[in-house]
Every structure is written in structure tokens, then in C-alpha cells.
Swiss-Prot record:
This is Prepro-urotensin II-beta. Keywords: Cleavage on pair of basic residues, Disulfide bond, Hormone, Secreted, Signal. Its main location: secreted. It holds the Pfam family Urotensin_II. The gene is uts2b. Urotensin is found in the teleost caudal neurosecretory system. It has a suggested role in osmoregulation and as a corticotropin-releasing factor. It is found in: Secreted. It comes from Danio rerio (Zebrafish). The lineage of its organism: Eukaryota, Metazoa, Chordata, Craniata, Vertebrata. Belongs to the urotensin-2 family.
Amino acid sequence: MMWKLLLLFALLLTVLEPLLGHPVVQSAEMSFGRPVVVEEEQALNPEELSFSEQAYLSHDAAGFGYPSLISGDISSDGLRTAGFVPSQAVKEALLEKPLWSRFLGSRKQYHKRGSNTECFWKYCV
């Protein structure tokens, strides 16, 4: 009975391990406001921004590959230049060979070419 409890606890820790790695933030510290929309001609003072907006802009300036909020690169062209093309991703996912065929070793059946009788096993001359 005790080993079942230990096994259940170990399984629970294994499942919850990715969630335990994130810090828990007090709800009073969290800001639920929408992001500030900044026009290109409008100048920003760092004192006017909240802490979360400063963190967002600093991550963007660090070069994480996201479209810039200040420069206004949020468009489908910006996403395409960043390397994500939705239609291409769907085509690649649909045209990709099924993974199970690689692991299970399923292959196409060999078919003879034409009416050649000079064949040895798979090789025809």
C-alpha cells in the first residue's frame, strides 16, 4: 500500500515539475492592463511606463525576434520576415511522412519494372 502512495507521489511530481519551475506571483503585483499602443511619432519616457511594459520593451530591444511595439512591425510581412509563414507550416506538416512508418519499418512493396525476366531479387538488368 505504501509503495502505491510513493509511486503516485513520484508520478504527480513528474507531471507537475514543469509548473513548479515557474515563480508564483502575488495577484496584487500582477497588472492586468492592456499593452500600450505607441504611435511612431510619439516619444516614450521610461518613467511613464509600468514595470511590465518596461520589461516587454527591454526584451524586445534585446533581440528576441519579436516584432517591435515601438517601430510598429506588427504585420503579416513582419511575421514572414521573422521566419513564420502559416501556410508553409501547414504544408510541411501535411506533406511530412508519418513518423510511425520510420519506427515500424513499413516499406513500399517492390514492383517489377516492365516485362524484364532478367531480374535477380530486386535488381533488374
